[in-house]
Amino acid sequence: MEQAKDFFDESKDLHELLNAEGVGCLSTATMFKNWTIEDVIGHLYLFNYGAVETLKGGDHFDNFWKPINDQVLDGKSLVEAQVPWLNGVTGNQLLDDWWQSVEDVFNAYKDADPKKRVKGGGPEMSARSKITARHMETWAHGQEVFDALGRDREEKDRIKNLVHMGVIAYGWTFVNRKLAIPEPTPYLILNAPSGEVWQWNDKESSSKIEGTAVEFAQVVTQVRNFADTKLSITGEPAIEWMKYAQCFAGPPEDPPAKGTRYKVGN
């Protein structure tokens, strides 16, 4: 699957940044729930491992997930719940283990049946959706790492995977919050990193979002408040969408408050 290569390349960009910065950067706090970069890498490693386990079928995913989920149900945060699983692995060893998990995910998914149903923390999904979700999470958590280190990421057109996730989650964003789905669905016209123009939905819609694909992806993955972007947002449906946008599964999560997520040094 092409999405497996996109996931690998996204992970590679993050890996190269961390190698350039050195292991000392792992103690740096990010603007995401005050997680350190080491927390972020542990989180990505954990869920990469889970992605490989779920593709094996049977009880593999359940055996991996139950001890972690039990801790979350007992009130622990995901970062706290991952500590026993990581079993004391930190620093360079964590970086090595995370990178090995990236290669394992890529090798498992590159030739997998895209339509195979796999388990996750929520409803079952296709293998294609699972690897796309791994790409999304790597990019989104990578954003807080690049931000914390004051570095710019060279964006690529593979971000289209994330934009598409955001687009198809339009209705679910509101249903998940027990809100009515506003009509009409907004028309999107977004500039890709390559300069291509991407469009979604009916161009005759009275509600519209224009801008860069990167900023749209930042909003739907909740790494930026829409008010901190240059997106042009027209019509009530588009405004409401950008207020609540959430392309990832799980209970409703509130986007970051205005001005709380940015690149250090800006």
Feature names for model-found ranges:
Residues 12-19, 48-52, 99-110, 139-146:
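Structural signal for well-ordered, non-membrane alpha-helices
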Residues 1-2, 50-110, 158-159:
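Short, helix-capping/interhelical loops that line the mouth of catalytic, cofactor-
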Residues 26-71, 120-176, 216:
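Short, contiguous alpha-helical
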Residues 18-30, 102-131:
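Acidic interhelical loop/turn segments
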Residues 178-220:
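Glycine/small-residue-rich hydrophobic helix-like segments
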Residues 1, 5-34, 39-42:
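Basic, Lys/Arg-rich alpha-helical nucleic-acid-recognition elements, primarily the DNA-binding modules
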Residues 205-266:
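C-terminal interaction segments
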Residues 4-7, 95-98, 131-134:
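Hydrophobic packing residues in well-ordered alpha-helices of helical domains and bundles
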